[in-house]
Design a protein with these regions (language model features):
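Conserved C-terminal helix/tail region of periplasmic/extracytoplasmic solute-binding proteins
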Residues: 66, 164, 378, 388-450
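Short, solvent-exposed loop/beta-turn-alpha elements that line the ligand-binding surface or hinge
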Residues: 115-129, 172, 200-201, 218-238, ...
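C-terminal lobe and pocket-closing loops
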Residues: 119, 280-293, 306-415
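Hinge/lid segment of periplasmic solute-binding proteins
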Residues: 99-153, 207-210, 294-303, 384-388, ...
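Short, low-complexity disordered leader/linker segments with a strong preference
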Residues: 1-38, 61, 432-436, 440-450
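Glycine-centered hinge/linker elements that transmit conformational signals in sensory
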Residues: 182-187, 225-257, 298, 302
Length: 450
């Protein structure tokens, strides 16, 4: 199959089996002012919960536009928004989407381009947006198809009190071998404390977000430059064996069902000594109203094995489906949600550590933010700047992406393999079998690109 046709057809693989047609927005002409209601679908992360709290008393009062939010867990969100956008359902006027989806959906004509509005509004200051984030949301035509709400890499978080109690010192650039040693010394199941929390929940963007960075730094890859699959290669296997073994020995309770949200709660409640995950978690951990470990957490670069850095690159961004009939109102919301003024609002109303950072250069010059985020801001920005979607490992890659492969089929492939790896964590299968099955699935994908 020609590559262009393969990509277009493979977009359908993002859909889950048995999806039904979505409803409509109720029609009506576009309206950017009072009396208008727009629908927003977003992932249930803390930053999105914050915007839900702030919208009515601020955005709606200023514009007269009401926003009806639907919040879903990450995996459910991905299924729901993919179904609606791909099927042209028109149920949502705006939605949070990630760096993986945006270039693919832009190619398929499913999203409005936002560069025109962003560049026309001088107060929005599009030039202030961090270049890695804008690049990850740009289509083949060079236009931006989603506006970054917050950006992130990944790093290692650790409980400083627990380390001090054991006389341990965390290096700024730890290796995975050091992390495993720390986990063994800090794990205390008798007191309900795990040595480390790592995602075990199936999902290409759940379990395989951290795991693929481990694969990269162990010298592995999903595909070589010529699309040769390497899912059961020694390096991929060694990384997965290490990850699964680390969780089984020293990980959190219920690890096969633990994703970002569950690990945030576990670590934030002081029930884990370390957590390797998104840099965006730091704001919540440093909020004393949301975390029991505020002021007790240290932040260091993503653990490595054979590479110098291994953090991922991701942004949750606001996109506007082509099917919306309320594009003007939708852009007003998107521009507000991703503006400097919104960051200031969050800082003043909810606390500066909760600002949705990682998207604007100016954020890191705000005195109040720098003070509240001093424990993690430098490592966060350094991690974002060192993330390399073009060359995240030890060999050339056929597609962009650090913790994912930037092709439509990866959502289905990554999720299927993650289900088997999660089962290995649960003890119902082996890593070798999981990756042998994954290799066969990857071979089927590779046929589209040979």
């Amino acid at each position: 199959m020609p590559k262009r046709l393969a990509i277009a057809a493979a977009g359908l693989l993002l859909l889950t089996a048995g999806c039904s047609g979505a409803g409509s927005t109720g029609g009506g002409s576009d309206d950017s002012g009072g009396g208008t209601t727009i629908t927003a679908l977003m992932v249930g992360n803390p930053q999105m919960e914050d915007i839900q709290k702030l919208t009515a008393d601020n955005f709606t009062k200023q514009t007269g536009i009401t926003v009806k939010f639907t919040i879903l867990p990450e995996n459910e969100l991905r299924d729901k928004v993919t179904q609606d956008v791909a099927n042209q359902g028109g149920q949502y006027d705006v939605a949070t989407v990630g760096a993986y989806e945006v270039p693919i959906w832009a190619k398929n004509g499913w999203l409005h381009e936002l560069s025109t509005q962003a560049q026309a509004d001088a107060s929005y200051d599009a030039g202030d947006l961090l270049k890695p984030m804008v690049q990850s949301l740009t289509g083949d035509d060079g236009k931006m198809y989603a506006a970054p709400f917050y950006g992130e890499s990944s790093f290692l978080m650790y409980n400083k009190e627990m380390f001090t109690a054991k006389g341990l010192t965390m290096p700024e650039h730890p290796t995975w071998a050091q992390v495993a040693d720390f986990a063994a010394k800090l794990d205390d199941k008798g007191k309900g404390v795990a040595g480390i929390c790592l995602r075990g929940l199936p999902g290409w963007g759940e379990l395989f977000a951290p795991l693929t960075t481990v694969v990269n730094t162990y010298g592995g890859t999903w595909f070589e430059k010529d699309w040769t699959p390497k899912v059961n290669a020694p390096e991929f296997t060694a990384a997965t064996d290490f990850y699964v073994d680390l969780i089984k020995k020293y990980g959190e309770k219920g690890a096969p069902q633990a994703g970002f949200t569950e690990c945030l709660n576990t670590f934030g409640q002081g029930k884990a000594a370390m957590w390797y995950d998104a840099t965006s978690a730091a704001g919540t951990l440093e909020d004393p109203n949301a975390s029991k470990v505020s002021g007790k957490v240290g932040y260091v670069y993503a653990p490595v094995n054979k590479t110098e850095y291994s953090g991922w690159l991701w942004t949750w961004a606001w996109a506007m489906p082509k099917t919306t009939k309320k594009a003007d109102a939708a852009w007003k919301f998107i521009s507000w949600a991703t503006s400097k003024d919104y960051e200031k609002l969050v800082g003043e109303k909810l606390g500066w550590s909760r600002v949705p950072s990682g998207k604007r250069t100016s954020t890191y010059s705000i005195a109040e933010y720098k003070d509240s985020a001093k424990a993690f801001a430098d490592v966060t920005l350094g991690s974002i700047e060192h993330a390399n979607p073009q060359n995240p490992g030890l060999q050339p890659r056929p597609a962009l992406g650090v913790q994912y492969v930037g092709i439509p089929e990866f959502a289905d492939l990554g999720t299927k393999v993650s289900q088997e790896v999660s089962a290995a964590i649960a003890g119902s299968t082996t890593v070798d079998k999981a990756l042998a099955d994954g290799q066969k699935q990857a071979e089927d994908v590779a046929k589209n690109y040979k």
